Swiss-Prot record:
Pathway: One-carbon metabolism; tetrahydrofolate interconversion; Amino-acid biosynthesis; glycine biosynthesis; glycine from L-serine: step 1/1. Keywords: Amino-acid biosynthesis, Cytoplasm, One-carbon metabolism, Pyridoxal phosphate, Transferase. Its EC number is 2.1.2.1. The gene is glyA. This is Serine hydroxymethyltransferase. It comes from the Bacteria. It is found in: Cytoplasm. GO terms for cellular component: cytosol. Its main location: cytoplasm. Its cofactor is pyridoxal 5'-phosphate. (6S)-5,6,7,8-tetrahydrofolate binds at residues 121, 125-127. The modification N6-(pyridoxal phosphate)lysine is found at residue 229. Coiled coil: none annotated.
Length: 414
């Protein structure tokens, strides 16, 4: 029998210590990694429930185990809320990640050797859209589209490639693209050549839920996503689909890719979807966009170039070449000042992938803390201060002190 006072702190002091240090880091650092966010206490509470004990292979009402009557309620709540959030015909909330959601679509409609088309990783795409070392690049023939001279998606070239190669699946979506994507144009060319159309909206899901970014659901056969990032839920994935594709997607996820779903995580997803349906979430996402714009403008004013010269979402790529500093060094320097970001390749980057000429910045996490345009502008200036004085320890310490003032004034969990 377990005792209710058998806490983590008592059971595993080493692990507890590491978690407490991470908690302190999250509180005292400004988080600008575009794919990260802070989830709510309610989401974390759901993930820590007894649902973690339950195996539930199958789907609500069609399980391979007994005792699933209550987890059926949990999963159905998640499904219904998700469909309402995006106006979808059908939804699968079982994928353990965005990558597995993408794999579920691949398994449902493709065979090894089929041709797929996605955005080039080097120009802002995601590794699961055909990168050579990913299973998508190893199992399928990949045709990649990219950007034009304005660093916008080259839709004309994409259409030419689609007509020439006739891929079975066209993928839209990105991990480092700041502008709005014309999903309707992708859908038209997919229909013209008889291809399936999939959108990976992992980065934009929260913005889309709030109407701050175009919704791909009316145009795509399949829409995949993570549940964290801008959606602010637990780490996981989901798939939205047209009604006629529900059976093949469900079969692809279980038993095709996964066994028992993580019911405690699905509970966290259900909570996050309910939060995203609230009016406050729309206000939050509006501020996410405003803060990203303010951050980008502050950096531009300090002589830094933003790829595409603007952002229309939560994310931006910063070209560091004018400051004669690499993305790797910038990430480390900013980290020492308690500003967390990630190095990122820019289009046609001359540097190696682990070095890069840029950094990627995002506004969702700082907006969750309560930052508004004034704070976002200040953060932009603090970033520029560090990058302009990379060898000045006094600048690092001054910026760190300014960061501390901001994080004390805007705690993650009040």
């Amino acid at each position: 029998m377990f005792s209710k006072d058998q806490t983590l702190a008592k059971t595993d002091a080493e692990l507890w210590s590491a978690i407490q240090k991470e908690n302190t880091r999250q509180q005292e650092h400004i988080e600008l990694i575009a794919s990260e966010n802070y989830t709510s206490p309610a989401v974390m509470e759901a993930q820590g429930t007894q649902l973690t004990n339950k195996y539930a292979e199958g789907y609500p009402g069609k399980r391979y185990y007994g005792g699933c009557e209550y987890v059926d309620i949990v999963e159905q709540l998640a499904i219904d809320r998700l469909k309402q959030l995006y106006g979808a015909d059908a939804a699968n909330v079982q994928p353990n990640s965005g990558s597995q959601a993408n794999q579920g679509v691949f398994l449902a409609v493709l065979k090894p050797g089929d041709t797929i088309m996605g955005m080039s990783l080097a120009e802002g795409g995601h590794l699961t859209h055909g990168m050579a070392l990913n299973m998508s690049g190893k199992w399928f023939n990949v045709v990649s589209y990219g950007l034009n001279d304005k660093e916008e998606i080259d839709y004309d070239a994409m259409e030419r490639l689609a007509r020439e190669h006739k891929p079975k699946l066209i993928i839209a979506g990105a991990s480092a693209y700041a502008l709005r994507i014309d999903f309707e144009r992708f859908a038209k060319i997919a229909k013209e050549i008889g291809a399936y159309f999939m959108v990976d909206m992992a980065h934009y899901a929260g913005l889309i839920a709030a109407g701050e970014y175009p919704n791909p659901v009316p145009f795509a056969d399949f829409v995949t996503s993570t549940t964290h990032k801008s959606l602010r839920g637990p780490r996981g994935g989901f798939i939205l689909m047209k009604a006629e594709h529900e059976k093949i997607i469900n079969s692809a996820i279980f038993p095709g890719l996964q066994g028992g779903p993580l019911m405690h995580v699905i509970a966290g997803k259900a909570v996050a979807f309910k939060e995203a349906l609230a009016p406050e979430f729309k206000t939050y996402q509006q501020q996410v966009v405003k803060n990203a714009d303010a951050l980008a403008k502050a950096l531009i004013a300090r002589g830094l170039r933003i790829v595409s010269n603007r952002t229309e979402s939560h994310v931006m790529l910063v070209d560091l070449r004018a400051k004669k500093i690499t993305g790797k060094d910038a990430e480390n320097l900013l980290g020492s000042a308690h500003i967390t970001c990630n190095k990122n390749a820019i289009p046609n980057d001359p540097e190696k992938p682990f070095v890069t000429s840029g950094i990627r910045l995002g506004s969702p996490a700082m907006t969750t803390r309560g930052f508004k345009e004034a704070e976002a502008t200040k953060v932009g200036n603090l970033i520029a201060d560090v990058l302009e004085n990379p060898n000045d320890a006094a600048t690092i310490e001054r910026v760190k002190a300014e960061v501390k003032k901001l994080t004390d004034a805007f705690p993650v969990y009040g």
